[in-house]
């Protein structure tokens, strides 16, 4: 039972690190002094890194599934299923982030100046 808890803790730690990276990884006092372009660049790079990781996880899962289908001896069904679920969770997370960004954009566009 320790392995699933470690997996959840690891996923939570990764999400917190991504949130810190998206926030610029700086304290509020230093982020106020920074320029808007630097914040936009760090957000864009964090978003690209997240999308690349999601894509990589999906490619890895598909590769393992294909290897299992052709009968590779070093790939078990458990590994395939776990990697497929990790890829699915990552995709769902990315989809929710996208939905929140679109919602925030629409809300900003509807604000009166």
UniProtKB/Swiss-Prot annotation:
GO cellular component: bacterial-type flagellum basal body
Keyword Transport tagged: no
Domain of life the protein comes from: Bacteria
Gene from which the chain derives: fliE
A single GO BP: bacterial-type flagellum-dependent cell motility
Subcellular location(s) per record: Bacterial flagellum basal body
Keywords carried by this UniProt record: Bacterial flagellum
Single GO MF annotation: structural molecule activity
Name under which the protein is recorded: Flagellar hook-basal body complex protein FliE
Family named by the database record: Belongs to the FliE family.
NAD as UniProt keyword: no
């Amino acid at each position: 039972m320790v392995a699933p808890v470690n997996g959840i803790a690891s996923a939570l730690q990764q999400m917190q690190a991504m949130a810190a990276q998206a926030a610029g990884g700086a304290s509020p006092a230093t982020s106020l002094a920074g320029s808007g372009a630097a914040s936009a660049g760090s957000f864009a790079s964090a978003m690209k890194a997240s999308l690349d990781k999601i894509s990589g996880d999906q490619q890895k899962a598909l590769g393992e599934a294909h290897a299992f289908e052709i009968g590779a001896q070093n790939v078990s069904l458990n590994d395939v299923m776990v990697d497929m679920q990790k890829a699915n969770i990552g995709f769902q997370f990315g989809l929710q982030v996208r939905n929140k960004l679109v919602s925030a954009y629409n809300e900003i566009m509807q604000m009166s100046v």
